């Protein structure tokens, strides 16, 4: 079993970032709700737990009814790191004082380190004229610790928060008022790595080659000689799940690839070539274009389109699954954020993680057991796994694509003609993004954008081509940059790149005579148009 760090979640929006930073240090971490009982904590320690991290929260530590840290956390003898609310709870429960702050801190702050603690010693972003090392951090709090608990010493301070960090190094307790897990805290990654390795004593035994070996062994033990069926969409999660399961059990896996006529250009061919031809995976390729297009005729409402596409997918998949009489397992590309959300860990009030996470909407009447080989991994780890399994990087690192496909990138009613025009326009846009490099970073603009695509607008505009008048459709280009997809900024693509994309689309895709670029951020707009 890998060395582990337990993260207790009290409802912070960035708790998952803590787990990701710990794993980036090569240490396995798990998130559990903050209201677990003492027995759970003691059991974790008995199984070799190396340390505990307490997350932030929107709640107030000193208000009645606020979630308390299990007492066992401070009794079992492993190092503990409290972050924001975690620091306040630690102080409150160990004899310190927490008060409402007259000067709330939200955003950047400059913190001075004190006391040469193991956590912060030697870390600094700049030095003051007086020689004090200073850290650039991200704060988000309305309460603050005003009196240290017995045994603690001051570890950090700001002008408006005299106790911005504290430590009881004899017991291995550390706490900071700022958020080391977010990228805005420059030394945050180093702090968390120092906590899990230098303070908790983790060696960093979490790596992808070992994970593959362990996952393959688990799948073989779980499945035995049974048959497995998987709905392959061509997306990252289902593709990596298929590659991993096939590595484990070979021809016991059958993938069902449903082409609803709303995929990207040549996507069906790429999936078949990658999995069937190159990797030898058994794939049932179902061309259900006519079925989907027929059901979408006359439907303009975005939500109605999504429901129709989802319902028809389930129907097609069910039909194909029924033909595979020996299948006893349904495999899904469920990943760790899905598991956390299904447990309600975002609220910090869930007590257990559900074992069944039916993200695909497939009915329980299939009577299949669930196989989720990626449920321990974050998205970036899934991509790393995909490359290690031999999947093409352009498949593993492709931008997100909605389940309904082009159905929600064609505004209004979906028609075969519209889908063909959009497919070709979108392919040109993506090709140019992949070919265009930003000289400052050396990266392509495809790598610099988090998501990019074309949108078909079912309106016509007047144009001139040669000596003739045209009256053809409009395409909008959308490219955004984001860390978490909760908020997003439109990408500042170079004008020559946009001009090249526009020229190619208008000249190569007959039926389109105007291209526009979407400069809306999220919020107020959403990333997708529908």
UniProtKB/Swiss-Prot annotation:
<dbReference type="InterPro" id="IPR029062">
    <property type="entry name" value="Class_I_gatase-like"/>
</dbReference>
<dbReference type="InterPro" id="IPR022955">
    <property type="entry name" value="GMP_synthase"/>
</dbReference>
<protein>
    <recommendedName>
        <fullName>GMP synthase [glutamine-hydrolyzing]</fullName>
        <ecNumber>6.3.5.2</ecNumber>
    </recommendedName>
</protein>
<dbReference type="InterPro" id="IPR017926">
    <property type="entry name" value="GATASE"/>
</dbReference>
<dbReference type="InterPro" id="IPR004739">
    <property type="entry name" value="GMP_synth_GATase"/>
</dbReference>
<dbReference type="InterPro" id="IPR014729">
    <property type="entry name" value="Rossmann-like_a/b/a_fold"/>
</dbReference>
<keyword id="KW-0332">GMP biosynthesis</keyword>
<dbReference type="Pfam" id="PF00117">
    <property type="entry name" value="GATase"/>
</dbReference>
<comment type="pathway">
    <text>Purine metabolism; GMP biosynthesis; GMP from XMP (L-Gln route): step 1/1.</text>
</comment>
<keyword id="KW-0315">Glutamine amidotransferase</keyword>
<feature type="active site" description="Nucleophile">
    <location>
        <position position="84"/>
    </location>
</feature>
<dbReference type="InterPro" id="IPR001674">
    <property type="entry name" value="GMP_synth_C"/>
</dbReference>
<keyword id="KW-0067">ATP-binding</keyword>
<dbReference type="InterPro" id="IPR022310">
    <property type="entry name" value="NAD/GMP_synthase"/>
</dbReference>
<dbReference type="GO" id="GO:0005524">
    <property type="term" value="F:ATP binding"/>
</dbReference>
<keyword id="KW-0436">Ligase</keyword>
<dbReference type="GO" id="GO:0005829">
    <property type="term" value="C:cytosol"/>
</dbReference>
<dbReference type="InterPro" id="IPR025777">
    <property type="entry name" value="GMPS_ATP_PPase_dom"/>
</dbReference>
<feature type="domain" description="Glutamine amidotransferase type-1">
    <location>
        <begin position="4"/>
        <end position="205"/>
    </location>
</feature>
<comment type="subunit">
    <text>Homodimer.</text>
</comment>
<keyword id="KW-0658">Purine biosynthesis</keyword>
<dbReference type="GO" id="GO:0003921">
    <property type="term" value="F:GMP synthase activity"/>
</dbReference>
<feature type="active site">
    <location>
        <position position="181"/>
    </location>
</feature>
<dbReference type="Pfam" id="PF00958">
    <property type="entry name" value="GMP_synt_C"/>
</dbReference>
<feature type="binding site">
    <location>
        <begin position="233"/>
        <end position="239"/>
    </location>
    <ligand>
        <name>ATP</name>
    </ligand>
</feature>
<feature type="active site">
    <location>
        <position position="179"/>
    </location>
</feature>
<feature type="domain" description="GMPS ATP-PPase">
    <location>
        <begin position="206"/>
        <end position="398"/>
    </location>
</feature>
<keyword id="KW-0547">Nucleotide-binding</keyword>
<comment type="function">
    <text>Catalyzes the synthesis of GMP from XMP.</text>
</comment>
<dbReference type="Pfam" id="PF02540">
    <property type="entry name" value="NAD_synthase"/>
</dbReference>
């Amino acid at each position: 079993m890998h060395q582990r760090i337990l993260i207790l979640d009290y409802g912070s929006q960035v708790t998952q970032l803590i787990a990701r930073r710990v794993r980036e240090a090569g240490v396995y971490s798990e998130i559990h709700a903050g209201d677990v009982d003492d027995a759970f904590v003691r059991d974790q320690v008995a199984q070799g737990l190396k340390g505990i991290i307490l997350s932030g929260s929107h709640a107030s530590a000193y208000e009645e009814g606020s979630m308390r840290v299990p007492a066992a956390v401070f009794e079992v003898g492993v190092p503990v790191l409290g972050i924001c609310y975690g620091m306040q709870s630690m102080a409150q429960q160990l004899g310190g004082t927490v008060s409402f702050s007259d000067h709330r801190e939200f955003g950047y702050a400059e913190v001075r380190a004190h006391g040469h603690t193991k956590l912060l010693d030697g870390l600094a972003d700049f030095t003051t004229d007086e020689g004090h090392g200073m850290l650039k951090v991200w704060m988000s709090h309305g309460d603050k610790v005003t009196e240290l608990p017995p045994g603690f010493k001051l570890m950090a301070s700001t002008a408006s928060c005299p106790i911005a960090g504290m430590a009881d190094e004899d017991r291995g307790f550390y706490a900071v008022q700022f958020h080391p897990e977010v990228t805005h805290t420059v030394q945050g990654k180093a702090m968390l790595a120092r906590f899990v390795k230098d303070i908790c004593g983790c060696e960093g035994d979490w790596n992808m080659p070992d994970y593959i070996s362990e996952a393959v062994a688990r799948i073989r033990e779980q499945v035995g000689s049974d048959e497995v069926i998987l709905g392959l969409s061509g997306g990252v999660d289902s593709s990596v799940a298929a590659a991993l399961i096939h590595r484990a059990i070979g021809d016991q896996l059958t993938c069902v690839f449903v082409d609803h006529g709303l995929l990207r250009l040549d996507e069906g061919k790429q999936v078949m070539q990658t999995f069937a031809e190159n990797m030898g995976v058994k794939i049932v390729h179902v061309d259900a274009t006519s079925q989907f297009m027929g059901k979408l005729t006359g439907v303009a409402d975005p939500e109605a389109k999504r429901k129709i596409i989802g319902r028809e997918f389930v129907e097609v998949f069910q039909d194909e699954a029924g033909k595979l009489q020996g299948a006893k397992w349904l495999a899904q590309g469920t990943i760790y954020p899905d598991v956390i959300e299904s447990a309600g860990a975002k609220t910090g009030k869930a007590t257990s993680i559900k074992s069944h996470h039916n993200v695909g909407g497939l009915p329980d009447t299939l009577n299949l057991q669930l196989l989720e080989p990626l449920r321990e991994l974050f998205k970036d780890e899934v991509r790393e796994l995909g490359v290690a399994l031999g999947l093409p990087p352009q498949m593993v690192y492709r931008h997100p694509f909605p389940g309904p496909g082009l159905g929600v990138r064609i505004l209004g009613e979906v028609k075969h003609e519209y889908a063909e025009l959009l497919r070709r326009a979108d392919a040109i846009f993506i090709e140019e993004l992949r070919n265009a490099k930003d000289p400052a970073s050396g990266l392509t603009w495809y790598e610099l954008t988090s998501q990019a695509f074309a949108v078909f607008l079912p309106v016509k505009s007047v144009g001139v081509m040669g000596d003739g008048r045209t009256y053809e459709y409009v395409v909008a280009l959308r490219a955004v940059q984001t860390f978490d997809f909760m908020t997003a900024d439109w990408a500042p693509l170079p004008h020559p790149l946009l001009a090249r994309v526009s020229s190619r689309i208008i000249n190569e895709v007959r039926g389109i005579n105007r291209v526009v670029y979407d400069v809306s951020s999220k919020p107020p707009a959403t990333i997708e148009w529908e």
